[in-house]
């Protein structure tokens, strides 16, 4: 079978290009509203808080690109949901001055879907594939040639033949929470791999204060910003969502402009109560339901079983609920009349499945005390 090679060329340099962001995937309506509201997402490396080592590495690669005008190496960003993988990828495109094509892997059902993205790219563009581990194995294999030689094969049904198509050079950035689901050969084609770390409370606090200034034109008190950060489950997305709901409550509570002195602890706790977020460690309804389920079953459970029992998608359990529960969580509780401070995970993963820890038990007991004070009125928090 012969190949007919086609060449697509775009003669533009970074300085003459008008950068655009192309979100190939249509996000769920609720997420889209959230992202539109969160237009304070950092646009460049200087605006990104934390991840210093990663930023320094990326700056070096981009400096080389600007000097040689050769595409930056393909990159793989690792880290659980909410640590800023998409933000970092978008910042790379902004720093380079190139177009940013964003696609969710779950929307790529066939090679034709991916080719529709490839045929529109310009020289040195960024293609960002979120949750790249969700790509079908065959599609992962077809990426090899694209990433190495910038060529791909497409089937021409009209001419009943396969064509080898030359495409513009580009940089692929993949984001994943599960490297084990990627082909080893595909992983090896990403020349730069980096682990994005969870944010510290101080970093999240700084994000909250910066967002308050940019979006709401108000100085969020340091004490309030830090408390919101501590309840953000180590992720920027949760911190921004808490700030948004906090400011919505403040706006609804006053006829005039919200001032810094109006942002009080009482108002913050009112917001948390309305949103069913605990003031202890910041867990929401779904996370508490997860823990209650484990505690009641008193046996190891698989992620699929838990997802079914709490009426959530397994991907939500794996990528959104579990990462924080598996991390070290600071908790204070009474045990045998003594105040105990624990810094341990709420769950553990064993060969038989997920099990709850003693910390999870004491956390639910604290939530029961809150329920007696009017919190979580519609939740069943009873355990043995």
Annotate each PLM feature.
Residues 91-92, 111, 123-153, 179-189:
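Conserved AAA+/SF3 P-loop NTPase catalytic/coupling segment centered on the Walker-B
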Residues 311-329, 335-339, 351:
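Short amphipathic alpha-helical interaction segments
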Residues 63-103, 117-122:
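Walker A/P-loop
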Residues 225, 249-276, 287, 350-351, ...:
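Conserved C-terminal helix/linker of AAA+ ATPases
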Residues 156-175:
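AAA+/SF3 P-loop NTPase mechanochemical coupling elements
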Residues 32-74, 78, 115, 119:
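Pre-Walker A (pre-P-loop) alpha-helix and adjacent loop at the N terminus of AAA/AAA+ ATPase modules
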Residues 222, 232-247, 283-285:
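The conserved phosphate-sensing helix
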Residues 177, 192-204:
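Conserved AAA+ ATPase "SRH/arginine-finger" region at the nucleotide-binding site
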């Amino acid at each position: 079978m012969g190949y007919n090679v086609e060449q697509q060329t775009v003669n533009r340099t970074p300085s003459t290009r008008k950068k655009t962001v192309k979100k190939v995937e249509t996000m769920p309506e609720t997420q889209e509203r959230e992202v539109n509201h969160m237009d304070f997402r950092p646009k460049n490396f200087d605006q990104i808080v934390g991840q210093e080592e990663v930023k320094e590495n990326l700056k070096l690669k981009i400096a080389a690109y600007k000097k040689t005008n050769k595409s930056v190496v393909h990159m793989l960003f690792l880290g659980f949901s909410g640590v800023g993988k998409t933000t970092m990828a978008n910042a790379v495109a902004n720093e380079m001055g190139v177009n940013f094509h964003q696609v969710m892997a779950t929307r790529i059902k066939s090679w034709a879907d991916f080719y529709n993205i490839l045929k529109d790219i310009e020289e040195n563009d960024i293609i960002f594939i979120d949750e790249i581990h969700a790509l079908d194995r065959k599609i992962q294999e077809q990426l090899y040639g694209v990433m190495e030689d910038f060529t791909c094969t497409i089937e021409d049904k009209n001419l009943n033949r396969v064509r080898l198509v030359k495409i513009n050079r580009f940089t692929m950035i993949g984001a994943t929470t599960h490297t084990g689901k990627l082909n080893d050969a595909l992983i090896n084609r990403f020349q730069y791999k980096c682990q994005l770390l969870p944010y510290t409370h101080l970093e999240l606090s700084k994000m909250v204060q910066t967002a308050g200034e940019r979006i709401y034109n108000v100085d969020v008190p340091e004490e309030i910003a830090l408390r919101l950060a501590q309840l953000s489950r180590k992720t920027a997305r949760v911190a921004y969502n808490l700030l948004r709901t906090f400011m919505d409550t403040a706006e609804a509570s006053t006829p005039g402009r919200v001032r810094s002195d109006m942002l009080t602890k009482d108002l913050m706790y009112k917001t948390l109560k309305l949103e069913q977020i605990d003031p202890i460690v910041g867990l929401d309804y779904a996370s508490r339901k997860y823990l209650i389920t484990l505690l009641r079953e008193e046996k190891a459970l698989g992620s699929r079983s838990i997802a079914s029992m709490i009426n959530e998608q397994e991907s939500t359990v794996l990528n959104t609920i579990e990462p924080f529960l598996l991390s070290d969580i600071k908790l204070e509780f009474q045990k045998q009349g003594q105040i105990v401070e624990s810094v341990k995970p709420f769950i553990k993963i064993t060969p038989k499945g997920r099990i709850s820890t003693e910390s999870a038990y004491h956390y639910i007991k604290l939530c029961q005390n809150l329920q007696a004070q009017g919190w979580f009125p519609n939740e069943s928090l009873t355990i043995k």
